[in-house]
Amino acid sequence: MGKSLYQKLYDAHIVHKNKDDVPILYIDRHLLHEVTSPQAFEALRLRKRIVRQPNKTFATMDHNVPTTTKNINHSGSMAKEQLDRLTKNCKDFGITLFGLNHPYQGIVHVLAPEQGITLPGMTIVCGDSHTATHGAFGALAFGIGTSEIEHVLATQTLQQIRYKSMQINLSGIIAPQITAKDIILAIIGKIGHGGGSGHVVEFCGPIITLLSMEERMTLCNMAIEMGATSALIAPDRTTYDYLKNRKFSPTGKNWEQALLYWKTLYSDHDAHFDKKFDFDVSNVNPQVTWGTNPSQVISIDQPIPSLESFIDPIERNSAERALIYMKLQSNTYLTDVSIDKVFIGSCTNSRIEDLRVAAQTIKGHHISKNTQAIVVPGSKLVKNQAEKEGLNKIFIQAGFEWRLPGCSMCLAMNNDRLEPGERCASTSNRNFEGRQGRGSRTHLVSPAMAAAAAIAGRFVDIRKFK
């Protein structure tokens, strides 16, 4: 029997395996940020250990950074301490740091791919749950905890169980105005918040070949929201074209050798998957979440489901609590719901293609007088490219705030957050209670849907927006 892509990557990285032990995998890339790394570095110092492979370790500042200024003192005392400690830790241990004033600084899951730090066939870890984003390149990437960060820093290895595998085959025809964000939200709505638990997901099928690398990253980024450990997409010509001539990509003969290996990274036709799921994208409409986890999602033209429609009592109780928290009612439409803020950004939707779509949507319009809207590019490279194309001017003329790169309003770890009771149309990946601030109400949407909501001051069907 053949092997799946996940099996190939896992087996290729085993460096130690006993009959009764969990295998130890070699880690090709270790990505760091300021929030989950301080304790790991402190543990290294206490044990008088060094970073085993600093040249395979990269750090950035993203979670806590201010997006209105480059002045680190404006980030708050706790955030400033974490940022200062990351600077010292990287200097002491010889690690490359993309700090606030570095020309490549950005969100870790935006920066690493665009720099060519992420490459097919690699194992990649980061102390962040959305590390699966890098799986769009055919890399086995997953989030780890602080104790595991210490272990990887010290040994460049990690003990890792072999998870089950799930194949999601995408077919059909993508309708106009439908994006990768709509597709993945619809999949999560179908499979459920825990439907991928204990599995590594591989997205495949004819639809994948039509998607850009940025769209593929959106799919893999949100696979975690169906409970998956990681997500994968086999590399192809689109992948190679994206990576060629990137800062850290191989060059010359090394590039040719890499291509030979990358072209072996696919699931064999007779590979075994523990679960298989076929999904026709033809019927996917613009999606918007109504509840407090990403699986509580509907098409914009559908009513919020009634509690009676939930057969599972646990799901029914979750829905009831979500409706109370979100201050919504069953059998009503989100197109009648006004919003307070709009956030276009995060490691899900802050890349140049996302900003182009949002800018195209709002061009010639102005945001609603009662709405605050911010755009936060995922990196300085994205920001520079957007400004080169004049997208920043379109946003500013429409009343949006054009910010500096960072995680921003995706999570309440910095100055960008919602006030209690405020409602936000957000291009981020999580809508949990309090995710964007205490008492915040988050609705996940695509960049186009978020942009249109900013103009209308409420949720609208992007297909009818003019």
Curated annotation (Swiss-Prot):
Role noted for this protein: Catalyzes the isomerization between 2-isopropylmalate and 3-isopropylmalate, via the formation of 2-isopropylmaleate.
UniProt keyword annotations, A-Z: 4Fe-4S, Amino-acid biosynthesis, Branched-chain amino acid biosynthesis, Iron, Iron-sulfur, Leucine biosynthesis, Lyase, Metal-binding
Cofactor, free-text remark: Binds 1 [4Fe-4S] cluster per subunit.
Reactions accelerated catalytically: (2R,3S)-3-isopropylmalate = (2S)-2-isopropylmalate
Keyword Lyase (UniProt): yes
Residues passing through the membrane, by range: none
Protein name per Swiss-Prot or TrEMBL: 3-isopropylmalate dehydratase large subunit
Iron-sulfur found in the keyword field: yes
Amino acids binding [4Fe-4S] cluster: C347, C407, C410
E.C. designation(s): 4.2.1.33
Listed pathway(s): Amino-acid biosynthesis; L-leucine biosynthesis; L-leucine from 3-methyl-2-oxobutanoate: step 2/4
Domain of life: Bacteria
Any matching Pfam family: Aconitase
The family this protein is said to belong to: Belongs to the aconitase/IPM isomerase family. LeuC type 1 subfamily.
Subunit details: Heterodimer of LeuC and LeuD.
Cofactor(s) needed: [4Fe-4S] cluster
Species for this entry: Blochmanniella pennsylvanica (strain BPEN)
NCBIfam families, sorted: leuC (TIGR00170), PRK05478.1 (NF004016), PRK12466.1 (NF009116)
GO biological process terms on file: L-leucine biosynthetic process
